[in-house]
């Protein structure tokens, strides 16, 4: 396609050494939950203040190569009236956009869901490109306690593949994200088995839809035991299982694998990423974290202008920790108790 070279260049830039993605594409409702946790009302002004804090962290671009935005943010300005997209570009951070329309029940399945958003996606993607976005994200989920049924896996894979083809057609590098939810009592071997099945289907349909592998990025879940499982897995074990999965299922043509944190604590997410980068990989193995980058910063800010600088330093510390983990050089110095806290049961975006 006409964007082929540009797609490859964008994907390679996002997957550059020591850098990863800041996911800040929470919907307004989810952003509201985050604000609520620090006692703030969910108003556009408060969302704008928080997003301004995130994108204006000095030197953030040294550790962050891309930022995923919610549609409101792509068209929003900072508190002092600069376009958020422009601020990111000045920071050397590529703007991205969440394009899916969320999850709805999948009729005919075992109480599972599927992802909406293909209708009108081509014209929306073209508009997002015009607005400065250069990559896209589509998140679908697979639930292990509910099966997953063959139907749900097929629907997830097909939807992702259609979205990826449409994105590339409009100049956006698609981030392919079939999140295998942490919920459940299953052990790590069961997660591994399901993940193999999911990624086999995803790549089958990506190929069927003529998606250019050099111009995509992946956002997988790490292979871990279920959140309610009796077993806990060390970073070494998580890395062993996850890399084994990637080696079996992900072609080396794919430039970058940007893991989601999916409810791990901030420190856990960094330790696991570090363990995966202890030896060389055929792809850039990095991060695309939301809560695992933002959590301590949010709590530090608390909605108070006088805390902005400290909150920005907290975010930079996390970004730098994950940058070191991408290089396999993270040692875990200076971590706060907040950063070590487990997230939550029934974690959802």
From Swiss-Prot:
The record marks 349 as: Necessary for preference for fructose 1,6-bisphosphate over fructose 1-phosphate. It catalyses: beta-D-fructose 1,6-bisphosphate = D-glyceraldehyde 3-phosphate + dihydroxyacetone phosphate. GO terms for cellular component: chloroplast. Keywords: Chloroplast, Glycolysis, Lyase, Plastid, Schiff base. GO terms for molecular function: fructose-bisphosphate aldolase activity. Belongs to the class I fructose-bisphosphate aldolase family. This is Fructose-bisphosphate aldolase 2, chloroplastic.
């Amino acid at each position: 396609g006409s964007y082929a070279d540009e797609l490859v260049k964008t994907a390679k830039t996002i997957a550059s050494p020591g850098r990863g993605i800041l996911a800040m594409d929470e919907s307004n409702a989810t952003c509201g939950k985050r604000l609520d946790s620090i006692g703030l009302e969910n108003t556009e002004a408060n969302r704008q203040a928080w997003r301004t804090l995130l994108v204006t962290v000095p030197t953030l671009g040294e550790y962050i190569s891309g930022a995923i935005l919610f549609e409101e943010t792509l068209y929003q300005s900072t508190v002092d009236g600069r376009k958020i997209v422009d601020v990111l570009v000045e920071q050397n951070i590529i703007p991205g956009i969440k394009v899916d329309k969320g999850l709805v029940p999948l009729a005919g399945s075992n109480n599972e869901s599927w992802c909406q958003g293909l209708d009108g996606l081509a014209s929306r993607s073209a508009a997002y490109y015009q607005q400065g976005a250069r990559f896209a994200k589509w998140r679908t989920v697979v639930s292990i306690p509910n099966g997953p049924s063959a139907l749900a896996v097929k629907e997830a894979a097909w939807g992702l593949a259609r979205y990826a083809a449409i994105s590339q057609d409009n100049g956006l590098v698609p981030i392919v994200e079939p999140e295998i939810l942490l919920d459940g009592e299953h052990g790590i071997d069961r997660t591994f088995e399901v993940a193999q099945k999911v990624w086999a289907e995803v790549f089958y349909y990506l190929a069927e839809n003529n998606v250019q592998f050099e111009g995509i990025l992946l956002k997988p879940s790490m292979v871990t035991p279920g959140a309610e499982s009796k077993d806990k897995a060390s970073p070494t074990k998580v890395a062993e299982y996850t890399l084994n999965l990637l080696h079996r299922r992900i072609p080396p043509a794919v430039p970058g694998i940007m893991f989601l944190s999916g409810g791990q604590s901030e420190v856990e997410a960094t330790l696991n990423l570090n363990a995966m980068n202890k030896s060389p990989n055929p792809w850039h193995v990095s991060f695309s974290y939301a809560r695992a980058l933002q959590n301590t910063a949010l709590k530090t800010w608390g909605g108070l202008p006088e805390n902005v600088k400290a909150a920005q330093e907290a975010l930079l510390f996390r970004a730098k920790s994950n940058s070191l983990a991408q290089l396999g050089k993270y040692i875990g110095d200076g971590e706060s108790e907040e950063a070590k806290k487990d997230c939550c049961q029934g974690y959802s975006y």
